[in-house]
Amino acid sequence: MQTADTLAVPDGQHNIFEHLAERERIKAIRTKSGTSLSMAAWPAIEPTPSLLYSDSHMSHPDEVLNPFPGNFFLTTSIPNIAGLLESNAWLQSGEVVERAGRAGEGNMNCVVRVTTSHRSFILKQSRPWVEKYPGYSAPWDRALVEARFYQVAESLPGLTSYLPRLLNFDPSERLLMLEDLEDAHDFTLLYGANSPGLADSERTQLVDFLLVLHRSARAPELRPPFANAEMRSLNHEHIFALPLRPDNGLDLDAITPGLGSLASDLRTDTRYSREVAALGARYLDPAQGVCLIHGDYFPGSWLKARGRIYVIDPEFCFFGLPEWDLAIMAAHLHMSGHSQAQIDNSLDRYGESAAVDRRLIQKFAGVEIMRRLIGVAQLPVDFGLERKTELLCLSKTLVVGEQSALKRRFLC
């Protein structure tokens, strides 16, 4: 079973990781000196090189290959962390770093839980690659967008109760210091066969977070700082384009025997492919945006802590369509076995307070289901071919509004 929101590695990438595994680990971590930049400062940052590698995906070693010797890169080394905190004046009087370790299996970023003599907190750093698979480049400045989200949330009534607090931010190092929601767990276990699913109260809280965000973050001046064009482009590639590209290098049969043939049938459906492309164009179009949205509203971004729901990882946020957040939520409710009545109830709760395009929600949800089954970002699921066939049939029904021949071919 793969870990939460893992990346399937296309053919030709494995040799890169094997080569890195054989290389001597290089410790090139330089502790930054100087003072922390103001949280309100957004300095110009050099463009990210197109392809970067580190060995940090291998059991998360303390040593990482740093191709940017002028930059600080976070590790679990106490001297590494203590030096950063001291230089940024983030430690309280008499506070000493005692322990540090990885906080969960983060996919995109380096996330470390730090325990001191006074407290615990989370350090989260974006790097110019995907943390779990550094053969994939990623927008380096995504941490700046995430920090902006937390800062804006502080001025939106009712929103901060759903979010961990942003304690400090160093934009030059793309590093956030966040409240530690101790003993929290995400909801990726929802996909398991024995999962009881979300309680009604949990689904209500998930919908209410979106209602507060979408209704209160509509000011036109939010559009430029939350364009997030690079992250949106990255998401577009992995959601709307790569899964339906026949030469994408993904060995789907290695994931589930027979899945490759199923995907091929879907890719050759001209009407389906055209509709997905049109939806992708709408997703990318900045003129479509009406409010600030989370952008990646799936169970890996939902936490249960202190008896309630929290929402994390808004790095994919942008000024966009509220239907996108609702669609991602609905898609994952489908994939985690929630009933249509439960999904409709959630959407109805939102619709009672805000007008949305239910048909657009359905279409976006269908695309999300498709990309999670035949795309790079695989989910931690044990679904066999029959279940994946049912879900891909549902994807086609949601996207183009007709029953799919896939189910007749593979299940009858």
Residue ranges of model-derived segments:
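Conserved NTP-binding catalytic cores of kinases and kinase-like/nucleotidyltransferase enzymes
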Residues: 15, 51-172, 306, 401-412
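Active-site Asp-x-Gly
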Residues: 133-135, 142, 291-292, 303-344
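Active-site activation/catalytic loop segments of kinase-like enzymes and analogous catalytic loops
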Residues: 148, 322-353, 365-384
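Conserved short submotifs of the Hanks-type protein kinase catalytic core
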Residues: 175-185
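Conserved kinase catalytic-core helix
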Residues: 187-227
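Conserved catalytic-loop position in the HRD/HxD motif
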Residues: 296
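Helical subdomain adjoining the active site within ATP-dependent kinase catalytic cores
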Residues: 358-363, 368-412
